[in-house]
Structure formats: structure tokens, C-alpha cells
Amino acid sequence: GGHALEQDMSNNEAFKTYIEAKLNLINKLYTSNIANKITVKNTVNCNHAGDFGYMANYAIKLACDNIYKDVEIDIYERFIEHFFYGEHCFIQCHGKDKKYMKNGMPLRLNPVTETFINQYIDRYQIKSKFIHFEKGDLHQIGYDCRKKFDYINFMSLAPPSNWVQHNCADAYSGFTLQIIEKDKRSPTQKNIFIEYSEI
């Protein structure tokens, strides 16, 4: 499944940086009063973080459980998980699992991946009016639409590593903000790009 990545921080530095940055982001969202409740969904079955991803996100969950009353931290340990919001079902994964996949899911939907996703939808008897399959891994924005579901790729918040630049092109960094209405098909979506000098 996974591949080794060069690190420019020790494990301790990476843990500290991740915890501080994520808690800072959650605190800014919470104090902005942007929503009545904040849910943070973490996909930890991936080819990057290993057990570190679970441990770091569990530490954040423990902290948030003791600090905030309206912040929920979900940690997805299976490769693919889904949740419902109104007429929507969101199916989420990293795009490449931590153990079995030789290659990750593609940027553009292909017949093999489409069949795989349709089998997941059928297995879990997902009947939602709007189904969105969301993933990362390739650090690039991508969108395909089929009759049964949308296929969405998100960029990475972090700058691309040397490995990503070599294998996936010199991608951009940032995040996607989505506003989803419970009963409408298309979310309002805005991509926020971060210049490396801003980090």
C-alpha cells in the first residue's frame, strides 16, 4: 500500500505541528460562530500517515471533547465510510488505503473505479437523492459527475512533497469550502488557495 516519504521534521515535531494547527483551525471555526455545530471528519486509513494519523486525531478528539460542547470529531478507520445529511450521502476515503492498493483511485473517474463505487453504494443500500464520493490522495482538484454519484477530488492543505511533485506534478495547496443545503443537489463550493509563502 504505502510508500516512504521524506520528512523535514522529526516525528515529535510533526505531531506537535499537526496538533497545534488542527486545534487552531477548530478554535477559529468555533469562535467565528459560523455554525451551531462543527463536525470534523478524519480519514485515517491511508497510505501516508499509518497509525500516526489515528493517534494524532484521537488526541485532538480528546482535547475537543473537553474544550467544546458543540464540536464532534469523527475518525474513519475503514478505507471508505459514509454519512448522511438531508437528501445527501457523502462517501469519503483518502483514495489509497494503508495496506492493499498498489495504485490509488484516479483523478478522473474510470470504469473500474466507477464499478467499485457503485458496488459500495449497492452493498450499503444507499438510496439518497444526491450521492457524493469524495477523496484526496492526488493533491489535485477534480470533478466528474455520473447519474448515480459525483466523484470529487480535493487538493491538499499542505505543500506538495518532493514525491508528489515528481509523481503527481507540482500541485497547488489549499482547501475547498462547501455550503450544502439539505435538499438541493449542488453545494456552493469555493476553492481557497494558499501560497507557500503564506505558510
Language-model regions, residue ranges each:
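Core catalytic region of metal-dependent phosphoesterases/phosphodiesterases
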Residues: 1-66
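Conserved beta-sheet core of the metallophosphoesterase superfamily
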Residues: 61, 72-77, 86-91, 96-196
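Charge-rich, low-complexity terminal tails
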Residues: 11, 31-34, 41-47, 175, ...
